[in-house]
């Protein structure tokens, strides 16, 4: 029967078929041709397998090892290749080669993701989205490892494993547990700002193309004269912001759980390349020292009025991965991967991630993960004293000396890439930061950014989640949101009361139904026992 051409993701196999003039010869992993891959080697047609069936053993042994550890966060994602092009000059702030000339293009790969879900989870969950960019620059790979929100839930990395545990499954029931999540949120009021964004309209983006990205952290830019400023990175979508209503997101989770991945793939295959603008905010060291709050606190944003956005360039995604596992799954990002001209700030969360991200890549992919094609700095080959280890994929740096310094033409230092000097002082202690202002910016979000309908949807979304929690957790959450604004707390209390009443009614109806079933159950059991008894009498003959 004649068929119309399907969507791009439906035509992948047909595209591959058309790209080949003839099939390859089927081989084992060591490249030997295979005579028959449709039957195992056995003694007779019904006999046992032979241990010398190396074709089967080769296939099965590799299959047993196909899966690698999934990311502990950001497990589910999609991505694509593209380029970054400089459109505006920022060399007065930054000497990085990637920004050196207007019109300069740098290859990139972006991986988008959800945060808390597993590899098979739905793309349309209410969850922050990862927005990680790898720039393959001529001075090494630069990873801008961001999210789709300008802030984060916590400001001290000591809480990160605990926070993520609340987003994962209960260790006993293996179910998502709202009590865990809201217990943590309500005990740590610094989460309030991000929680309001998460449960607002932007908590469920309409795919990956219609959301912004943010470096979130404060970084440091250094120019060729050694002068430094603090910086925040913004990636603004040119497609316009679009979000999904909760009911649509829930429907898609069942009908099209890979909605965002499919949308990105089909868009690029159709030539509808998504575009973003890379922008920065800049703050001087003097401004940072005298600012009204800690500018390195990732739970807060910098005022756009005081620190306006500066355009840097555009980002375009124009090529889908040739293999999902090799590229999207094996790509490894780390905020510690920076290039000359881009440095770190005292941001505590950033400092914590400098260790955590490379460490988790070592766990997932091994010590030589940077040698994988998707991760290697192919425009600036690595020369160092690191050798050997599992999966040393390239030439292992040949005969170059494995120590430094040396007298035998080994790799040498480059004197013009010295990091900027900066001063720190203070007592060594564990500063808990509980006295930070956790509610002023959430109040601005409530009063100045959200309109009346957005505030109403925020309240309903929070109530819909909180209704599953213990009463004392609900009360503590209401208290936090009341500190944002009295109207917020009052509205949430009213919405939660209605949600609780509806929940109680539903549970009473379920209990009544279960009680009726339990009354009928003994009769059914008696009937089955009589049948078994009669069957036993029959079988004895």
Swiss-Prot record:
CDD domains: catalase_clade_3 (cd08156)
GO cellular component, one term: peroxisomal matrix
GO biological process, one term: response to hydrogen peroxide
Residues that hold heme according to the record: 357
Active site positions: 74, 147
Keyword Membrane attached: no
Recorded catalytic activity of this chain's protein: 2 H2O2 = O2 + 2 H2O
Molecular function GO terms recorded: catalase activity; heme binding; metal ion binding
UniProt name for this protein: Catalase
Protein source organism: Ascaris suum (Pig roundworm)
Gene assigned in the entry: CAT
């Amino acid at each position: 029967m004649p068929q119309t051409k399907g969507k791009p993701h439906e035509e992948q196999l047909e595209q591959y078929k058309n790209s080949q003039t003839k099939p390859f010869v089927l081989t084992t992993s060591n490249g030997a041709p295979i005579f028959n891959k449709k039957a195992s080697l056995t003694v007779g047609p019904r006999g046992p397998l032979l241990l010398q069936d190396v074709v089967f053993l080769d296939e099965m042994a590799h299959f047993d090892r196909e899966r690698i550890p999934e990311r502990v966060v950001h497990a589910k994602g999609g991505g694509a290749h593209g380029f970054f092009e400089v459109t505006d000059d920022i060399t007065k702030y930054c000497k990085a080669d990637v920004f050196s000339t207007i019109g300069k293009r740098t290859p990139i790969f972006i991986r988008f993701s959800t945060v808390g879900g597993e590899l098979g989870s739905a793309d349309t969950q209410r969850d922050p989205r990862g927005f990680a960019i790898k720039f393959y620059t001529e001075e090494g790979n630069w990873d801008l490892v961001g999210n789709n929100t300008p802030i984060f839930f916590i400001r001290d990395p000591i809480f990160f494993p605990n926070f993520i545990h609340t987003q994962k499954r209960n260790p006993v029931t293996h179910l998502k547990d709202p009590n865990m999540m809201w217990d943590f949120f309500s005990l740590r009021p610094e989460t309030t700002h991000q929680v309001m964004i998460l449960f607002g309209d932007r908590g469920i983006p309409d795919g990956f193309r219609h959301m912004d990205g943010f470096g979130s952290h404060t970084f440091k830019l250094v120019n060729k004269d050694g002068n430094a400023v603090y910086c925040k990175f913004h990636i603004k979508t040119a497609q316009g912001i679009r979000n999904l209503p909760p009911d649509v997101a829930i429907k898609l989770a069942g009908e099209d759980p890979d909605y965002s991945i499919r949308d990105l793939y089909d868009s690029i295959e159709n030539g509808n390349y998504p575009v973003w603008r890379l922008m920065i905010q800049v703050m001087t060291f003097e401004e940072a020292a005298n600012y009204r709050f800690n500018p390195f606190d990732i739970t807060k944003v910098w005022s756009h009025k005081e620190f306006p956005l500066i355009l840097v360039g555009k980002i375009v995604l124009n090529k889908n991965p040739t293999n999902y596992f090799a590229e999207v799954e094996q790509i490894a990002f780390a905020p510690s991967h920076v290039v000359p001209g881009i440095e770190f700030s005292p941001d505590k969360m950033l400092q914590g991630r400098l260790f955590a991200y490379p460490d988790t890549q070592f766990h997932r992919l091994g010590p030589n993960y940077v040698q994988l094609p998707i991760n290697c700095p192919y425009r600036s080959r690595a020369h160092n004293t690191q050798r050997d280890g599992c999966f040393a994929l390239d030439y292992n740096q040949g005969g170059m000396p494995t120590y430094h310094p040396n007298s035998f033409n080994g790799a040498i230092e480059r004197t013009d890439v010295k990091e900027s000097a900066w001063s720190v002082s203070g007592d060594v202690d564990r500063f808990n930061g509980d006295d930070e202002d956790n509610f002023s910016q959430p109040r601005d979000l409530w009063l100045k950014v959200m309109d009346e309908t957005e505030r109403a949807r925020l309240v309903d979304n929070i109530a819909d989640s909180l209704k599953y929690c213990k009463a004392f957790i609900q009360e503590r959450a209401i208290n936090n949101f009341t500190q944002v604004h009295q109207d917020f707390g009052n509205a949430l209390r009213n919405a939660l009361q209605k949600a609780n009443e509806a929940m109680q009614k539903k549970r009473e109806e379920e209990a009544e139904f279960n009680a009726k079933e339990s009354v009928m159950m003994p009769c059914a059991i008696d009937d089955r026992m009589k049948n078994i008894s009669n069957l036993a009498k029959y079988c004895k003959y």
